[in-house]
From Swiss-Prot:
The keyword ATP-binding does not apply. F(1)F(0) ATP synthase produces ATP from ADP in the presence of a proton or sodium gradient. F-type ATPases consist of two structural domains, F(1) containing the extramembraneous catalytic core and F(0) containing the membrane proton channel, linked together by a central stalk and a peripheral stalk. During catalysis, ATP synthesis in the catalytic domain of F(1) is coupled via a rotary mechanism of the central stalk subunits to proton translocation. The gene is atpF. This is ATP synthase subunit b. Coiled coil: none annotated. It comes from the Bacteria. Belongs to the ATPase B chain family. It is a single-pass membrane protein.
Amino acid sequence: MNINLTLIGQSLTFIAFILFCMKYVWPQLIAMMEEREKRIAEGLEAADRADKDLELAQKKAGKQLTEAKEQAATIVEQANKRGNQIVEEAKEAAVAEGERIKAAAQAEIERQVAQAREELRGKVAALAIQGAEKVLGTTVDAKAHSEMLDKLAAEL
């Protein structure tokens, strides 16, 4: 193997090329790789933050869902209580109305009984007068014997 001038020239050219690349090309490649590494790291960080945010949002949504269910249960319970209260009030009102109607009917019955008694007293008094007229054969003066008729009516 002969080392000639061509091999030395190629070696010098290769060394010059390496020095040129190290001075001008290599720093730009390193800067681009560092920038890309930085962007990848930021992307991974953002993904981690997004995962944490998602987990936090899921916890918050679960908490809100639980609160909403509790509120719905409370509202349903209150509605049931109010419904039962309305039913009880309606029952009480119906009982009171029934008692009022019963009392009114009882008063009406008593009034009609009293009226019937008065009518019967009047009829009995008239029959007594007619019977007395027939027995005595004379007309009995109702005005003269009104006290007697009143006593008789009161006794009946």
